[in-house]
Regions:
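Flexible glycine-rich, low-complexity coil/linker segments exposed to the extracellular/periplasmic environment
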Residues: 260-292, 354-385, 446-472, 530-619, ...
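Outer-membrane beta-barrel signature, preferentially recognizing the C-terminal barrel domain
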Residues: 398-400, 619, 623-625, 711-770, ...
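Outer-membrane beta-barrel transmembrane strands
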Residues: 187, 203-206, 214-225, 293-338, ...
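C-terminal beta-signal and adjacent terminal beta-strands/loops
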Residues: 4, 528, 823, 877-886, ...
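Extracytoplasmic beta-strand/coil segments of soluble accessory domains associated
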Residues: 99-141, 168
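Gram-negative outer-membrane beta-barrel transporters
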Residues: 767-769, 781, 786-885, 923
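N-terminal periplasmic "start-of-domain" segments of outer-membrane beta-barrel proteins
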Residues: 60-93, 119, 127, 137, ...
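Outer-membrane beta-barrel translocator/receptor signature
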Residues: 145-150, 159-166, 173-272, 301-309, ...
Length: 955
C-alpha cells in the first residue's frame, strides 16, 4: 500500500514539524450544532439569539473547552440534526479553507484538488448533490469544465465566516436541493460585537514544499455601529497568492488485448465476464488480462491569485424592525501549466501490438510489465507507436457575486414577517491552450508497474529530455465560458400561539436559475509524416514478437521541411524546468524525472489559433430552471409522562419547470447539418418532514428521530443537449434533457449523552432510501466511419438504500494531574453501507458501491491549551469509494482509502496579538485512484506538505 512505502526522510521531516507543533499553540475550534444566525430565518424549534446579543456569544471560541461547552448547549437545544464549526478570531478555523474545515464534521468527507479541500460529500452524497448557502442565499458553482452544481470551497474566504453548519435533517422552510444535506456558511455581522468597534487582521505566509515558494495572504475585517446602535456597517477583504504543484503518474484506463492480431483492442470482444478465443489470457485461467491504456506522467503547476470583498449594512430603526443589505465578491485567477509525457497506446489498436515474450503478468489479471511494439510497416510513420509531450496551458478566471436585501418585522409579540430578495452570479472562463508534440513511428515502448507505488515506469527508445524524433506538433485552443445566475425572492410568516404549538410558519419562494456554457475551438497542426505511409523496411514476425526492431526506418512519406519547422518551433522554446517529478519520496518510482516542457513560448511560436470564429455548437448550451415553492410547518412542545418532547412538522411543495437549449447535428461529413434544439420539462414534488426530540433525562440524555423527503437536481451539463467526442480515446459523452431529479426519503434516530459541561457522547443511526438517481451507461455509435464509445446519463432503475451509524465524542481530561489536565480529544466515526445499487464492474461482474460512499471515515483531534499556548494535531481518514461505475474503457473509477495528518500551534503574546504555525499533510500522504483493483492504478498523486506561519491581531 502507498502508506507503507513512504521514505524515511518524508517521515522524519514530517515528524520534525509535528514535534514543533506540539510545543507551541491555539487551534480554537469546535464542533457544534446551532440555529442559523440573522439575517437568515431561524429554523423552527432552534434557539434564536436574544435581541441585542450577537450570535457569536452563543458559541464563542475564546478557548477550546469553552467553545466545546457552548457547542454542546446549542446542540442540546437544536431541533435539527446538524453539526457546525465556528471561530471567534479571524482565520481561527481548524483548517486552512472552508472545505477542509468541514471534513472534521461527522459524516462529511471531502474531495481535494491539488491537495486542497474543494468539495464536500455528506453521508456519501456527491458534492454536486449538497446545497450550499451563504447567509441563506445559494452559492453557485464556478466550475471551469462542464457545468456542475458543486461549489468551489477554496474561493470562500474563511476569514469572512462566523460559523459553518452542516444540516442533515431538513425542515419545510429550507430551500430544497441537498440530497445529503445543506452546508450553511454564516458570515460575521455588524452587530456581533455588542455595539463596540471591531478591527482584526492577519498576515501570513505559506510554504509549499513541491513548489519551493513562499506565498502571502492578508485579511482585514472591521465593523462599527452608528446612531445609538441603530445602524451597523461591516467591511472585510482578503488577498492571497498560492502556488500549487502536484505530480501525477496516471494510466488513463485498462484494456484487454486481442491475441489474434496481436493488437490492442478497445475492449477485446468480451461482453463482460471471462474471455473468448480472441482475448489474451497469459495464465490461461479463463479471464482476460488487463493492459495499460495511455500511461503518462503529469507535472501540474498552478499559480492562483485570490481576492474577496464583503460588505454588510444593517439598520434597526425601531426595536421590532431589522433591515439589511449585503454583498460579497470573490475572484480567483489561476495560471496553469500541466506538463505531460504520455503514450499513445490507444493507437496500437490498429498500428501496434504487445510483445508477449517481454510481458509479465502480475496480480489480479494485470500485467506488471509490458512491451508495446510497432506493427509491421509502421516504424517511422504517422500511424505507429508514439510518445507525446503535451502541455495544457492558460488561465482560469473564477468570479462569484452574491447580493441580498431583506428584513424582519415583528408585527406583534406573536406575529413576524420576514422577506428576502437576492441575486447571485458565478462566472468561470477557462482560456485553455493545448500544445502537443509527438514522436511517432517508434519501434517499442516499455511500461513497468512492479514498483511499490503502482505508478507506471516508462522506457522509450528516445531521450524525453530532447526534441529527438518529433514529427508532429499541434496547438489547440479551446476556451470555455460558463455562467450561472440565480434570481430569488421569498417571504415567510410566523405565528406563535399560546399552546403546545409553539410556532406556525408558512411562506413562498421563487428562484430562477439560468446556466449557460460556450465552447470555442481553434487548431493548428504540423504533420511531418504523411499519415498511413509505410516505412522503407518490413518488420519480420520474429522481430515483431520480441520487439527487437530498431527505429531506424525513414518514412517515404516524411516532409523534411515540416519536420525542420517543428524543430525550429520547439528547440529554442522548450525547457525542462527546475522541478523533478515525484520528488516527495520515490515510492518505488524510478521513471523519468524530467521531460520536455512545452510552455507558452512554444505555443506562441507555433501561432496560437484564434478560435472565436469556431463556436462548437454541440457543446454550447443553456439550461433554465424556474422553481416556485410553498411550505407550512409547525413547531410543538409537550410533556407526556413527564418527558419533554418537542419537534417540527411540515411539508414543502415545489414546482420546477426546465428548458434545455442547444444544437444537434444530423448527418455526417459534408451532409452534416446543425439545428437548434430545445426541450422543456416540468415536475412537482411534495416533501414532508418531521424532526422530533425527547429529553429522557433532564439536561443529560436526549433522543432524536427524524423522517424527511429530499430532492437534488441533476448537474446542468447532464441536462444539456450537449455532445462531445475524444478522437484520441475514441470516446464521447452526451447530455440528457429528460433526466428526473434525485429523490430520497431520509430517517435518523440518535441518542446524545451530555456527561458534563464539556464531555459528550452521541450515536446516530441514519437511513436514506434513494428512489431516483442519475447513473451512467455506454453505447457504441458509428461517427464518420469510426466506432466511438459514448457515455450518457440516465435515471437509475434500482432502488438504493444507504444505512449508517455516526458516533461522536468529546473528552476533556481535566481530571488528570499536572499539565495533562489541559488536554482533550474530539473524535468521530461514520459507517455507511448501501444495498440495491445494480451497477456492476463491467469486466469482473463484481458489485459496486453507490458513487461517493465510503464505508468508513474517521476524524480524531487531540489538543493542549493553557493561557498562553495551544496546540492541535488532527487525523482524517476515509475508506475507498466509487467515483464512476463506467469510466475510461468501461472500467470503474475508484478513489482509494486516504488519510492525512494536520497540525496547528499558536502563542498569545498578549490579549491582542498572537503568532501561529500550522501544517497541512505533514507526512506527505499520496492520493490514488484505481480501476477497482490496487494493481490497476489510474492516478498516483503527490502534492507535498504546506506550512503556514503568521500573526493575528485585533483591537
Amino acid at each position: 500500500m502507498i502508506g507503507t512505502s513512504r521514505s524515511w526522510r518524508s517521515h522524519a521531516s514530517g515528524l520534525a514539524v509535528a514535534t514543533f507543533l506540539l510545543v507551541a499553540a491555539d487551534p480554537s475550534f469546535a464542533q457544534t450544532a446551532g440555529a442559523q444566525a440573522a439575517p437568515a430565518a431561524t429554523p423552527q424549534g432552534a434557539p434564536a439569539p436574544a435581541a441585542g446579543t450577537p450570535a457569536g456569544d452563543e458559541i464563542v471560541v475564546s478557548g477550546i473547552r469553552q467553545s466545546l461547552a457552548n457547542a454542546l448547549n446549542i446542540k442540546r437545544e437544536s431541533a435539527q440534526v446538524l453539526d457546525a464549526i465556528s471561530a471567534e478570531d479571524i482565520g481561527k478555523f481548524p483548517d486552512k479553507n472552508v472545505g477542509e474545515a468541514l471534513q472534521r464534521v461527522t459524516g462529511v468527507q471531502i474531495t481535494r484538488a491539488g491537495g486542497e479541500g474543494s468539495g464536500v460529500a455528506i453521508r456519501g452524497a456527491d458534492p454536486a448533490l449538497n446545497r450550499v448557502e451563504v447567509n441563506g442565499q445559494t452559492q453557485l458553482s464556478t466550475g471551469a469544465g462542464v457545468s456542475s452544481r458543486a461549489v468551489e470551497f477554496r474561493d470562500i474566504p474563511s476569514e469572512f465566516v462566523s460559523r459553518l453548519e452542516v444540516v442533515k435533517s431538513a425542515t419545510a422552510d429550507m430551500t430544497e436541493g441537498g440530497l445529503g444535506g445543506t452546508v450553511r456558511v454564516i458570515t460575521r455581522r455588524p452587530f456581533d460585537n455588542n455595539g463596540k468597534p471591531f478591527l482584526a487582521g492577519s498576515a501570513q505566509t505559506v510554504y509549499t514544499d513541491l513548489a519551493k515558494r513562499w506565498d502571502p495572504k492578508f485579511a482585514l475585517i472591521g465593523s462599527k455601529t452608528f446612531f445609538e446602535d441603530k445602524l451597523g456597517i461591516l467591511l472585510s477583504g482578503t488577498y492571497e497568492k498560492r502556488s500549487l504543484w502536484y505530480d501525477q503518474a496516471r494510466t488513463t484506463g485498462w484494456r484487454q488485448v486481442d491475441r489474434n492480431q496481436p493488437v490492442m483492442a478497445p475492449a477485446c470482444t468480451t461482453d463482460r465476464i471471462g474471455v473468448d478465443e480472441n482475448c489474451v489470457d497469459i495464465d490461461r485461467n479463463g479471464f482476460g488480462d488487463f493492459f495499460p491504456d495511455i500511461p503518462r506522467y503529469v507535472i501540474n503547476r498552478e499559480l492562483t491569485t485570490r481576492y474577496a470583498f464583503n460588505g454588510i449594512v444593517e439598520y434597526r430603526p425601531v426595536d421590532n424592525l431589522k433591515l439589511f443589505v449585503e454583498g460579497t465578491y470573490t475572484r480567483g485567477k489561476q495560471k496553469l501549466n500541466s506538463q505531460f509525457l504520455q503514450l499513445g497506446t490507444v493507437q496500437a489498436a490498429t498500428n501496434g501490438g504487445v510483445s508477449l515474450a517481454n510481458t509479465t503478468l502480475g496480480e489480479d489479471q494485470t500485467v506488471s510489465h509490458v512491451r508495446f511494439v510497432a506493427a509491421p510497416g509502421t516504424i517511422g510513420t504517422a500511424g505507429g507507436l508514439s510518445a507525446t509531450y503535451r502541455n495544457i496551458l492558460g488561465t482560469i478566471d473564477r468570479q462569484n457575486i452574491n447580493s441580498q436585501v431583506g428584513g424582519d418585522w415583528d408585527v406583534s409579540d406573536r406575529f413576524t414577517v420576514s422577506a428576502r430578495g437576492s441575486y447571485a452570479k458565478a462566472k468561470a472562463v477557462n482560456n485553455e491552450i493545448n500544445a502537443t508534440a509527438a514522436a511517432q513511428g517508434l519501434a517499442f515502448i516499455d511500461v513497468d508497474y512492479s514498483g511499490s507505488s503502482g505508478a507506471p515506469n516508462i522506457v522509450l527508445p528516445i531521450d524525453p529530455t530532447t526534441t529527438q524524433g518529433l514529427t508532429q506538433f499541434i496547438v489547440l485552443r479551446r476556451p470555455r465560458y460558463n455562467n450561472q445566475t440565480e434570481k430569488a425572492g421569498k417571504i415567510d410568516f410566523e405565528y406563535k400561539p399560546e399552546s403546545f404549538l409553539t410556532s406556525i410558519r408558512f411562506g413562498v419562494q421563487k428562484r430562477d436559475v439560468d446556466v449557460t456554457s460556450k465552447l470555442y475551438d481553434g487548431t493548428k497542426t504540423y504533420n511531418g509524416y504523411v499519415a498511413g505511409t509505410p516505412g522503407q523496411g518490413n518488420v519480420t514476425l520474429a522481430n515483431y514478437a520480441t520487439g527487437s526492431s530498431v527505429a531506424q526506418v525513414v518514412s517515404t512519406g516524411s516532409n523534411a521541411a515540416i519536420l525542420q519547422q517543428i524543430q525550429n518551433i520547439v528547440q529554442p522554446n522548450f525547457d525542462l524546468g527546475d522541478h523533478n517529478f515525484f520528488n516527495t519520496g520515490s515510492l518505488g518510482f524510478d521513471g523519468y524525472q524530467r521531460f520536455l516542457n512545452l510552455g507558452m513560448d512554444v505555443a506562441n511560436a507555433a501561432g496560437v489559433p484564434d478560435p472565436f470564429g469556431n463556436l462548437n455548437p454541440t457543446d454550447t448550451w443553456g439550461v433554465y430552471e424556474k422553481n416556485i415553492a410553498g411550505y407550512v410547518s409547525t413547531a410543538f412542545a409537550f410533556e407526556p409522562a413527564g418527558i419533554k418532547v418537542s419537534g417540527v412538522l411540515g411539508a414543502r411543495v415545489i414546482n420546477t419547470k426546465t428548458e434545455s437549449r442547444g444544437s444537434i447535428v444530423t448527418g455526417t461529413g459534408l451532409a452534416a447539418r446543425v439545428s437548434p434544439f430545445s426541450q422543456k420539462g416540468e415536475y412537482t414534488e411534495f416533501l414532508p418532514s418531521v424532526n422530533l426530540k425527547a429529553e429522557l433525562i433532564p439536561n443529560k440524555l436526549f433522543a432524536r428521530a427524524t423522517a424527511t423527503e429530499v430532492i437534488a437536481r441533476p448537474a446542468p451539463s447532464d441536462l444539456a443537449p450537449r455532445f462531445t467526442l475524444d478522437s484520441v480515446g475514441f470516446t464521447g459523452s452526451r447530455g440528457n434533457p429528460s433526466l428526473q431529479p434525485y429523490r430520497a426519503k431520509q430517517y435518523d434516530f440518535g441518542l446524545e449523552w451530555y456527561i458534563s459541561k464539556v464531555n459528550f457522547l452521541s450515536a446516530t443511526f441514519f437511513r436514506k432510501d434513494i428512489s431516483s438517481f442519475v447513473d451512467r451507461t455506454t453505447q457504441q455509435e458509428l461517427i464518420n466511419g469510426v466506432n466511438y464509445t459514448i457515455t450518457l446519463p440516465v435515471n437509475g432503475t434500482s432502488k438504493v438504500q444507504i444505512n449508517g451509524v455516526e458516533v461522536g465524542s468529546q473528552v476533556a481530561f481535566d481530571f488528570l494531574p499536572s499539565i495533562l489536565k489541559n488536554t482533550g480529544v474530539t473524535a468521530n466515526y461514520t459507517y455507511s453501507k448501501d444495498k440495491g445499487y445494480n451497477q456492476l464492474d463491467y469486466f469482473t461482474g463484481g458489485a459496486l458501491t453507490f458513487p461517493g460512499l465510503s464505508r468508513h471515515s474517521v476524524n480524531v483531534s487531540g489538543y493542549y491549551e493553557d493561557s498562553k499556548f495551544s496546540i492541535r494535531m488532527s487525523y482524517n481518514w476515509r475508506s475507498k469509494y466509487l467515483i464512476a461505475a463506467l469510466d475510461r474503457g468501461n472500467n470503474p473509477a475508484v478513489g482509494a482509502a486516504f488519510g492525512q495528518w494536520d497540525g496547528s500551534a499558536s502563542y498569545n503574546i498578549n490579549d491582542h496579538i498572537s503568532v501561529f504555525l500550522e501544517g497541512v499533510n505533514l507526512f506527505h500522504a499520496q492520493r490514488t485512484e484505481n480501476a477497482n483493483s490496487a494493481y490497476r492504478q489510474n492516478i498516483v498523486e503527490t502534492y507535498g506538505r504546506r506550512i503556514y506561519g503568521g500573526v493575528r491581531a485585533k483591537l
